[in-house]
């Protein structure tokens, strides 16, 4: 059995640290992609009293949030109109991505005789989603004047927040400042938000009315310098499994597909029942590390869909079937932390955590 153990205390402490750091700004907690792999229902249930909003990528994720909490939920992605009636009935906040969305939403709202809560996503330089910057003011004005829309927020997203000195950050901030000025001229109550985790850490002055700290809430810090108080934030989860079999190699034998790992006579291998079918990175095979009884052991051979093997050498520490295996550590400096695994596999911590799938049990402790 593979379990992602999540520390409720660490999670809540992370959020409290962030809230203190951002001052009076509201906190919108992103829980998309199954709460970055941590389990959306459990995360929402244990944080709803600490945050102002939750944010997700699509309608189906939003329904999972509203099933366990009453906080406002913002959907970042495009509007799936097949779900729009339920979204409106549950007061889920939609993101207007194009001027044309306004008329479509108005027509549906009229039919339901219920207003739609909306945030307008403005493309200030990410060039992925959102209303074109040059059309922003017209779209904001139109939505604000609508009898069927409640324009609750206006937002954008930073493209290069992980590089605090990138010139695009200033360009996007300047553009967003002009949008904020126009928006606040209509109403001071409209929530303006730009910053993800690395955005407000790189430049505290861009918190505006609300911030969206996703990866930071789960305990992952940027590589650039941040204030000492932020350094108290810790990863909230450990991925654990068990040794299910010990194998002793004979002379000339190997292990796994294509037998790319060739051991020595008498070498012992531990079989762990987790693989890329669980969302664990296949690239770790033959180069990753696991922790068994406070000793690091290297993976041996290719990772399979449902299992991996590690070399115990001569097994001088007497690893046994049933021993606990730590696959992902909550200590960033460890060789099996999400940070270290991301470096080994040329990716980011978001990827390592969010791809862990539902074959892995989530447990809040």
Swiss-Prot record:
Entry's Gene Ontology BP terms: D-alanine biosynthetic process
Cofactors required: pyridoxal 5'-phosphate
Pathway connected to this protein: Amino-acid biosynthesis; D-alanine biosynthesis; D-alanine from L-alanine: step 1/1
UniProt key word ATP-binding: no
EC primary class: isomerase
EC number(s) recorded for this UniProt protein: 5.1.1.1
InterPro entries (UniProt xref): Ala_racemase, Ala_racemase/Decarboxylase_C, Ala_racemase_C, Ala_racemase_N, PLP-binding_barrel
Catalytic activity: L-alanine = D-alanine
Any Pfam family: Ala_racemase_N
SMART domains the record matches: Ala_racemase_C
SS bond partners: none
Keyword line: Isomerase, Pyridoxal phosphate
Ligand binding (substrate): 128, 305
GO MF annotation list: alanine racemase activity; pyridoxal phosphate binding
Coiled-coil regions listed in the entry: none
Residues modified as N6-(pyridoxal phosphate)lysine: 32
Entry's Gene Ontology cellular component terms: cytosol
Catalytic center residues: 32, 257
Record-stated family: Belongs to the alanine racemase family.
Role according to the record: Catalyzes the interconversion of L-alanine and D-alanine. May also act on other amino acids.
PANTHER family attached to this UniProt entry: ALANINE RACEMASE, ALANINE RACEMASE, CATABOLIC-RELATED
Name of this chain's protein: Alanine racemase
Native source organism of the sequence: Francisella tularensis subsp. tularensis (strain WY96-3418)
Gene that encodes it: alr
């Amino acid at each position: 059995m593979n379990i992602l153990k999540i520390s409720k205390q660490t999670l809540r402490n992370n959020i409290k640290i962030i809230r203190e750091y951002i001052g009076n700004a509201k906190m919108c907690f992103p829980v998309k992609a199954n709460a970055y792999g941590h389990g959306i229902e459990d995360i929402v249930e244990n944080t709803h009293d600490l945050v102002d909003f939750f944010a997700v990528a699509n309608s189906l994720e939003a329904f999972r949030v509203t099933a366990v909490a009453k906080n406002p939920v913002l959907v970042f992605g495009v509007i799936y109109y097949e779900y729009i009636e339920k979204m409106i009935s549950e007061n889920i906040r939609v993101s207007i991505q194009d001027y044309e969305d306004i008329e479509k939403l108005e027509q549906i709202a009229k039919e339901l005789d219920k207003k739609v809560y909306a945030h307008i996503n403005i493309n200030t330089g990410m060039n992925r989603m959102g209303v074109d910057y040059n059309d922003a003011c017209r779209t904001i004005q139109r939505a604000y004047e609508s009898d069927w829309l409640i324009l609750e927020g206006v937002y954008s997203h930073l493209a290069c927040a992980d590089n605090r000195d990138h010139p695009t950050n200033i360009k996007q901030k300047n553009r967003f400042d002009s949008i904020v000025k126009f928006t606040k001229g209509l109403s001071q109550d409209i929530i303006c938000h730009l910053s993800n985790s690395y955005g407000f850490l790189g430049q505290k002055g861009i918190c505006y009315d609300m911030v969206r700290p996703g990866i930071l809430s789960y305990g992952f810090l940027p590589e650039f310098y941040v204030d000492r108080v932020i350094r108290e934030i810790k990863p909230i989860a450990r991925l654990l499994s068990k040794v299910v079999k010990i194998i002793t190699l004979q002379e000339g034998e190997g292990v796994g597909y294509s037998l790319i790992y060739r051991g020595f006579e008498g070498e012992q291998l531990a079989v762990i029942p987790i693989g890329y079918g669980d969302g664990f990175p296949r690239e770790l095979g033959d180069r990753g590390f696991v922790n068994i009884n406070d000793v690091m052991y290297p993976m041996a051979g290719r990772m399979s869909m449902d299992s991996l093997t590690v070399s115990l050498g001569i097994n001088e520490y007497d690893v046994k079937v049933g021993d606990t295996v730590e696959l992902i550590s909550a200590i960033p400096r460890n060789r099996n932390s999400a940070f270290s695994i991301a470096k080994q596999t040329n990716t980011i911590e978001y990827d390592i955590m969010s791809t862990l799938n539902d074959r892995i049990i989530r447990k809040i402790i």
